[in-house]
From Swiss-Prot:
Organism whose genome encodes this protein: Methanocaldococcus jannaschii (strain ATCC 43067 / DSM 2661 / JAL-1 / JCM 10045 / NBRC 100440)
Family of this protein: Belongs to the Ni-containing carbon monoxide dehydrogenase family.
PROSITE patterns reported for this sequence: 4FE4S_FER_1, 4FE4S_FER_2
Subunit structure: Heterotetramer of two alpha and two epsilon subunits. The ACDS complex is made up of alpha, epsilon, beta, gamma and delta subunits with a probable stoichiometry of (alpha(2)epsilon(2))(4)-beta(8)-(gamma(1)delta(1))(8).
Organism classification: Archaea, Methanobacteriati, Methanobacteriota, Methanomada group, Methanococci
Protein name: Acetyl-CoA decarbonylase/synthase complex subunit alpha
Cofactor(s) required for function per UniProt: [4Fe-4S] cluster; [Ni-4Fe-4S] cluster
Residues annotated to bind [Ni-4Fe-4S] cluster: 251, 279, 318, 514, 543, 578
Amino acid sequence: MVMGNNVEMDIKKLLTPLVKMKNANISMSIKFGEEEEEEWEPMGPTPMPKIPTLRHWDFKLLERYPPFYMPICDLCCLCTFGKCDLSRGKKGACGLNIKAQQARIVLIACCIGAACHAGHSRHLVHHLIETLGRDYPIDLGNEIEVEAPIARTVTGIKPKTLGDLEKILDYCEEQITHLLSAAHTGQEGDYLDFESKALHAGMIDDLAREAGDLAQIVAYNMPKGDEDAPLIELGFGCIDKSKPVILCIGHNVVPGSYILEYLEENSMEDEVEVCGICCTAIDITRVSDKPKVVGPLSRQLMFVRSGVADVVIVDEQCIRTDILEEVLKTGAVLIATNEKMCLGLEDVSHMDEDEIIGYLLRNRAALLLDEKKVGKVAVEVAKIVAKERKDRKTLPDLNEVVELAKQCTECGWCNRNCPNAFKVKEAMALAKQGNFKGFIDLYKRCYGCGRCEAICPRNLPIVSMTTKVGEAYYKDLKFKMRAGRGPIKDVEIRSVGAPIVFGDIPGVVALVGCSNHPNGEEEVAMIAKEFLERKYIVVATGCAAMAIGMWKDKDGKTLYEKYPGEFRAGGLVNCGSCLSNCHITGAAIKIANIFAKVPLRGNYAEVADYILNKVGAVGVAWGAMSQKAAAIATGVNRWGIPVILGPHGAKYRRLYLSNGEKFKVKDKKTGEILEIEPAPEHLIVTAENVKECICMIPKLCMRPNDTPKGRANKIYHYVDVYEKYFGRMPPDLEKFVRTEKDIPFMMKDKIMAYLEEKGWKPLEKYPQDPTILY
């Protein structure tokens, strides 16, 4: 029997001679192996949307939040007509102008990001179907009935098995193909249609991530919305160097899971140290609480250079492309485990495990695509290599740091090439005198990109020098991070739905993204701390979730130890890895469905319209750097959720900014078209520094649906943070005070005095049930 095949035939061939039918020529189609889709909810208008299907919704958003372009290059070099200069109104040989070219590059970035997550999810689902079967159930327990809110809304599919996730990924891959084809020379020519396609790519990215995370949650028995998920050890200082150390870098949990399985089966969990960097670190700690998290990707080069790891396992995404060179310098062994990162290595997958171990001990690196073999190979190699490297020195000692610093000519190229313009030259000048104050400061804030080294005319190992000083002076690099809990439970949504929609909970702040921070990880923790204290709900994923854990209060406690892991006011929720960003969007969708009874199935625009107008949530990608982050942010934007980027986010080339004037909405209760406050004011915007970011958050959590009490709550926080960080009232406060009822009682006198100075007038009317779908 072949699944999904159609059989067509002439029914006359089936008739016996006893049956007389004149001109009977009937075609019939018989479907094998596919069950009828369960009618769990009436199908909405847009299941499996194609590129143009939601274009009307995109254009509604783009009319209110037109793209603002910041070209970092005026040239187009994508075809052999070029390179074409698009500055000063010029067109390229194909006819594109600079606006369309910038939008095209944004689309390409979003397609790369979406393809990355779709490829990751496809690998997971394919591997898990191979090992567990296509009928393996998707069961998140009794407390989660809406298990796949994005899939339900976008595709109309309610996935019940791993096999159902294949259908979702088939759709994702089809859409990515069409989207990427639109970026070819001589295809799309309008910047707004490029943006609509970028928004579509972002939505596909969101959907692909949900498929991948659902698969790994059910297959590896990861936490299923557990607010009391275990606290995991985090930081350089928690790694036990007396044991063989295996370091996993990347995003794919499969190789790491086999290492943990081999250790458990052979009762060696306490003999070998397993740790991780980036999202693989988060996901292996969702499988078991034994592994440890070194930190976000900003700590990758420093930790590898430290020489602690005996075996380095790389899978996919956000891995330094020179990782092989860096690992071999330390005498460690590298195993590449994913087809997306082969690093020019010999494929040893066909060998048996003992042969592979021998090969690695001789050659120090190999490509091993059979993940089932990674467990034994990594552990046994680590045990041997750890003995070989026991006394190996990989970093200069402090005296050598001084001698190296003396070679510095203080030319200043390091400062100029640093993405954050850190004072590397000044740290060198102090180190010449044996004063490491500059390097101590650098260690806390440095991203570890290595650009200072790349441009140094004396070839000084600046990152290694910084790492050594950090190791010597920071003895307590031990933190705690709550393991990624996955989705938000339905009962939590029922508890917070009304307070969020009406504004009594002032907002949901989602801290996500990479670690290209302008000033170190602590700024992410400071943002989280500020809004936890103000009883916002704070959710986190990926590198941001790790960064939040890398700060302690005066009592030595991290934010994860101080605040509960529940999705409630004052709760700090670590959803998990990059894939787990889907649960943040999913929570907003579930508010629309569980609280407001908005149907999900194939009903994207209505759900997104509800979120835009009623769910006070904002994403903060303070260290966003990758194409994946671009796709994540753009996907969130299509749902109607605003995003704040760090200062490096301007390099994505495009923001969605309103003009700050009044918006128009329709009140569904009266049918009137009303002019209202600009809420939320922008859809994606950058902040120059952390103070500016903190002050943007309360403003971007405002929604037209806020009750007077809820809006007063949000205005209180907006005014309070502005006075705290800038010592004055917000310069645009008058835009967001609709009537006197919106003014918090304890601030009424000073706010009224300010409004009188501004010539403020109350809105005559504001909507009870706002929508932009008219």
